[in-house]
């Protein structure tokens, strides 16, 4: 074999491998090809970790390039296997046939799935083998699909009505919690104002006592009594709000758990009883988009699985809730301790002023309740899940008009 033939084959293979490692290599030799055809063992080209030996007609790679190439190959192979499994379990033979025989449908799928050319080609070849297996089970699958259609159309309207009722109750509970919270905030503002006034009266009585031969102590006594009444009012308000909120949250938890269980039944049926749900959809274009989106999700999940990620989740509004807890503790200490003694009127006056400023600011901002916001979030999630099932119901129902 002459140098031109051997070198052309080796260089072609080497260029392909180097491109797969994201590097482009150009070899420049200080001689031409025409006069060399006998002694091949000394003709070699080197670049980084790659080595091409013409004499032995062997192509070898070493180091990170080889490892990266092997890992990339295995990852693509695993993705193809997972995607094929999805098609076998979730996609009807009808849709599989359309994707494999209709170029436009396949292009839409590849675009929706965001597949590179090499992965799309590998998946296409795997699906061609799957098509033979799928055709054998097609008749059985159609029977299961029809059973699912009948069950879904019969059961879903009743479940939907119950879940909608739960969503409305959750929002009503959230509104109730917020109304009680706002009322208690107003009560706390009044109570803090009264506490501040009682502190001023008590302090004034003590200051004026030397100049009034003790008669001003009556003012102090009145301030103590007013402060005690303020403390009782504040404590009662806190008990009322806590009791109502706890009761509402318990009811909301029950409603949410029941609704989630009902939704879970339908999702499990969709996955286990009739995995070929897509064969029942009348809109083939939308079904193709759906399949593409699912395959894209599988591909992205594999990419994320290779990255170690630590997620720290901080609940929205947790800072404000902690701030309210601290302020509530301060308020409880202020009011509870006032009943015990009037000798520290100056300290209690300062605490009452702090409480008054905080509660007034909170009231001005709308007196939002973290518990109410959480219930609204749960209601929104239930509504979104219910909407997905409602869309499936509309597609399964031949009597439905868009």
From Swiss-Prot:
Keywords: Cytoplasm, Lipid transport, Transport. Its main location: cytoplasm. It holds the Pfam family ApoL. The keyword NAD does not apply. The keyword Repeat does not apply. One of its GO terms (cellular component) is membrane. GO terms for biological process: inflammatory response; lipoprotein metabolic process; positive regulation of canonical NF-kappaB signal transduction. It comes from the Eukaryota. GO terms for molecular function: lipid binding; lipid transporter activity. It is found in: Cytoplasm. Disulfide bonds: none annotated. May affect the movement of lipids in the cytoplasm or allow the binding of lipids to organelles. Belongs to the apolipoprotein L family. PANTHER family: APOLIPOPROTEIN L, APOLIPOPROTEIN L3. This is Apolipoprotein L3. It comes from Homo sapiens (Human).
């Amino acid at each position: 074999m002459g140098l031109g033939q051997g070198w052309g084959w080796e260089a072609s293979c080497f260029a392909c491998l180097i491109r797969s490692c994201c590097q482009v290599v150009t070899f420049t030799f200080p001689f031409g090809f025409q006069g060399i055809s006998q002694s091949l063992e000394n003709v070699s080209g080197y670049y980084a970790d790659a080595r091409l030996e013409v004499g032995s007609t062997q192509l070898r790679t070493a180091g990170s390039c080889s490892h990266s190439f092997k890992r990339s190959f295995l990852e693509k192979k695993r993705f193809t296997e997972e995607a094929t499994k999805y098609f076998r379990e979730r996609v009807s033979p009808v849709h599989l046939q359309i994707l494999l025989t209709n170029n436009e449908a396949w292009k839409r799928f590849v675009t929706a799935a965001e597949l590179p050319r090499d992965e799309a080609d590998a998946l296409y070849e795997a699906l061609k083998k799957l098509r033979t297996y799928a055709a054998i089970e097609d008749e059985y699958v159609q029977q299961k699909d029809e059973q699912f259609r009948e069950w879904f159309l019969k059961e879903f309207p009743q479940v939907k009505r119950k879940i909608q009722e739960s969503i409305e109750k959750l929002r009503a509970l959230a509104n109730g919690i917020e109304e009680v919270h706002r009322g208690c905030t107003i009560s706390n503002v009044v109570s803090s104002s009264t506490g501040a006034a009682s502190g001023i009266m008590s302090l004034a009585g003590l200051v004026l006592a030397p100049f009034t031969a003790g008669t001003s102590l009556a003012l102090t006594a009145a301030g103590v009594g007013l402060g005690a009444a303020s403390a009782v009012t504040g404590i009662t308000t806190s008990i009322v709000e806590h009791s109502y909120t706890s009761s509402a949250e318990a009811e909301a938890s029950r409603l949410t758990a029941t609704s989630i269980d009902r939704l879970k039944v339908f999702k499990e049926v969709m996955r286990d009883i009739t995995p070929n749900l897509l064969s029942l959809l009348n809109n083939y274009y939308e079904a193709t988009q759906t399949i593409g989106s699912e395959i894209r999700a599988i591909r992205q999940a594999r990419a994320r699985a290779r990255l170690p990620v630590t997620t720290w989740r901080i609940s929205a509004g947790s800072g404000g809730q902690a701030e309210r807890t601290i302020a509530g503790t301060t308020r409880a200490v202020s009011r509870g301790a006032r009943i015990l003694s009037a000798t520290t009127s100056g300290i209690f006056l300062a605490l009452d002023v702090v409480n008054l400023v905080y509660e007034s600011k909170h009231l001005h901002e709308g007196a939002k309740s973290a518990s109410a916001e959480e219930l609204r979030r749960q209601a929104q999630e239930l509504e979104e899940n219910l909407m997905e099932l409602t869309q499936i119901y509309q597609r399964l129902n031949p009597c439905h008009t868009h």
